[in-house]
Amino acid sequence: MELEIADPAFRDRLSAPAYHVRQHNGCSYWNARLVRRDVPARYVGATHEYLSVDGPAERLDAIAFADHACGSSRKEKVERDLALLSAALAANPADARSMFYLAQTLRDAGRHAEARDGYAKRIEAGGWDEEVWYAMLMHARSCLALGDAVGFVDGCLSAYEFRPTRAEPLADLARYYRERGQNETAMLWVEAGRRIPYPEGDALFVDEGVYRHAFLAEAGIAGYYCKSPERRRAAHEATLELQLRRDVPDAVRGLARRNGMFYAPSADALFGAATRVPLALPMDEPYAPMNPSVMLDGDDLVAVIRGVNYRLGDPERSWPRLPAIRTRNHLARLERDGTAREAREIVPAPSIPPAAPSLVVGFEDLRLFRWRGRLHACATVRDRNPAMRCEIALLALDDDARIVELALLHGYRDDLHQKNWMPAVDGDELMFVYLCDPTIVLRYDPAARRVAVHREHAPALALDHLRGGSQLVRFDHGWLALTHEVAMIDEANRRYLHRFVFFDRDFRVSAITEPFRFADEPIEFAAGLAYDATRDAVLASYGVQDCRAMMATIDAAAVRRALVALPGSAGRPETARA
């Protein structure tokens, strides 16, 4: 048991004879915990004792107890409680509380038929309406455990009729019908349950998850299969909400993120028709283009296009058949239709130290930018240390696409594999957004050739699944970037989705779009972004299936409209400019 103190000054305001305090472990209930010394009180019950107070008691919201269920072993407790409660009922057969907890203990022991009968006896005994209602709900659940579907449905309906201010029976019905593929019926119970507010006045066994997230989670699954566009839209919105809620369990949030791949719109559906062009360069076999990074260099459109020697899904051209995974990069100046005016392979100048022997060779997924008058890129590299650990390399390029300076960016979490840092050129400073939740901004010190934490922010929503994608580019009053997230279909298959993320001037996440997809194929990765203010257009470059390099031109006004402000933030660009 852990005491949680929301208001440390609560002691100064204690004046009532006694106080009820909330205890919770996903299920919430209130019982007397603080009693003045002169107030008569006694413990009641053979087990699951509670403190009975003579006289009035108030609720104390300033503290609570988190129950981590760390008491005696479950088996020993069940056996002990069965003996104590059976003895109590033998002495007093009308003891309604002992009836209730005997049924509860039989349920915990997996003796569902006896539990069902025990709950029926407690219902018949009457008395405290909350305990009677809970016995009705548990009687229904015991029927379901015994395969009695009719008894379960009837029991849930009876429990709801008895206490329509409690939504737990409707959550059970929604799950029951959804698990049986009756999704339209499930949505009826979802819609009814969502209209029931949290029962603030109830003291016994309030399932907090039902009122916080259960109906949203059920809607996100069942609504996908409904015929009604309104229900499908509500299901999509429920899934988007759960993906970002901090106050739901990790498993619920994770399920919503996985389910998000089924709802994710195409970029065209979200932003209007985008112009797509391939960024194709002639590459020697066996290399194929992927994961380009575009930027606007003045009026010039410039891109780094990565070429790789492996092929997804081809065992003969994948690890471990290949002796090494190799990357070659080309710097290209492009027309707006994606054709290259000129292209040169990026190679180290003779002054750059040679790479170490490695099974993964070359600079991966460059992000291109201009800093201090020179083209630069940051990349992941594995062939600069004997352990083949992923490191971030900062590359300075000359006009002939030669790497004339190389710095490995150490100084923050050097013990981890590092990938996908997002560069931002802020005047004379070079920053990197390392994570979105918390938003960690690293500053590069060119004299020391190291990075250090410059800023750290905690966004209002859960954004821990957003991973680095493009550069950060100036956009309206802040910065715009593309991030990616991965939905795992199973252990071997995954789906990539992207979001536009808007940062304020101080690199706080201010607004995000919903996740979307550039392509209809599962593997896509955006590493480049540019904002063309003259045309008010966003240029996004991305790879598809690790074998195609693409660029999309998107209406910037549509991006602004799709960005949704985070609570407490400066807002989306359109709002801030108005």
Predicted features, each with a name:
Residues 97, 130-134, 168, 209, ...:
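Start-of-helix register in tetratricopeptide repeats
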Residues 81, 115, 152, 186, ...:
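Single-residue signature of alpha-solenoid repeat helices
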Residues 2-117, 127:
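Catalytic-site signature of metal-activated, phosphate-bearing donor transferases
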Residues 265-287, 296-358, 370-464, 474-522, ...:
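Beta-rich carbohydrate-recognition and catalytic domains
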Residues 101, 138, 172-175, 179, ...:
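"A position-specific structural signal for the A-helix of alpha-solenoid helical repeats
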Residues 93, 127-130, 164, 198, ...:
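Short coil turns that delineate tetratricopeptide repeat
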Residues 106, 143, 177, 222-223, ...:
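Residue at a conserved register position within TPR or TPR-like alpha-solenoid repeats
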